[in-house]
Amino acid sequence: EQCGRQAGGALCPGGLCCSQYGWCANTPEYCGSGCQSQCDGGVGGEGGCVDLGSIISRSTFEEMLKHRNNAACPAKGFYTYDAFISAAKAFPAFGTTGDVDTCKREIAAFFGQTSHATTGGWPTAPDGPYAWGYCHKEELNQASSYCSPSPAYPCAPGKKYYGRGPIQLSWNYNYGQCGQALGLDLLNNPDLVATDRVISFKAAIWFWMTPQFPKPSCHDVITGQWSPTGHDISAGRAPGYGVITNIINGGLECGSGWDARVEDRIGFYKRYCDMFGVGYGSNLDCYNQTPFGLG
């Protein structure tokens, strides 16, 4: 016997169910009638992946973002595995929803999009253009204040809300909402997203996890929890990685045919899916999708 009263109350590894007879597995015979402990089989309320560290190891993180600490990268030394794992704990469903392949695909998609946003790569870069994600932590062009008049999220005097962090969080209304969710005053302190490495990752994961009408969350799309409406279908928005690009930057990149930025997002995503050994899914681009909010 491996678990339960037959084994001194031991729990099964990996969140598996302990059957009435003291054996570990996650099938109905073990998790059903008589099950002694962990009777959701590791699926739990959030999904089939026990913890994020089992989906993306430190060594995988380092290989995915292998040139982020290059001397030429402005963000060198900023983005760390520990900061990522720490930030993700504030969002228990992130990277842990669905079966293991779904969890891996979500992490590949998150890093695919954020690597594009922070890339330092170029077509002939060492190890290819998709090994240079997370080279930047702030938008290169900081001339714009990204301030949209908002009574709910007023711009602070002298502050700019240009892109910062992995997702390049932009605009006062995003800083305001994100700050509320994280318990931080990001309207007055937007630089925290580029100076505190845990807050930086938290802001990116917050954006990923949070729907903003009429857009679903990136998380719900990649985990298969988003069902397009008839309106979405007529606008070409079908489930897949392409809809996530539409959520993030559809107004500039989607619905107008081929776009190098979209291809770059796809290139990172495919590299990471290949590293995780998972399929890409369908509908990777957004070339025939109307941007959200425009139809």
Swiss-Prot record:
Positions of the Chitin-binding type-1 domain: 1-41
GO MF entries: chitin binding; chitinase activity
Domain of life: Eukaryota
One Pfam match: Glyco_hydro_19
Disulfide bonding pattern of the chain: 3-18, 12-24, 17-31, 35-39, 73-135, 147-155, 254-286
Entry keyword set: Allergen, Chitin-binding, Disulfide bond, Plant defense
TM stretches of this protein: none
GO biological process: carbohydrate metabolic process; cell wall macromolecule catabolic process; chitin catabolic process; defense response to fungus
Family: Belongs to the glycosyl hydrolase 19 family. Chitinase class I subfamily.
Function field: Probable inactive chitinase-like protein that does not exhibit hydrolytic activity toward chitin. May bind chitin and be involved in plant defense against fungal pathogens.
PANTHER family named in the record: CHITINASE 12, CHITINASE-RELATED
Protein name: Probable inactive chitinase-like protein LaCIC
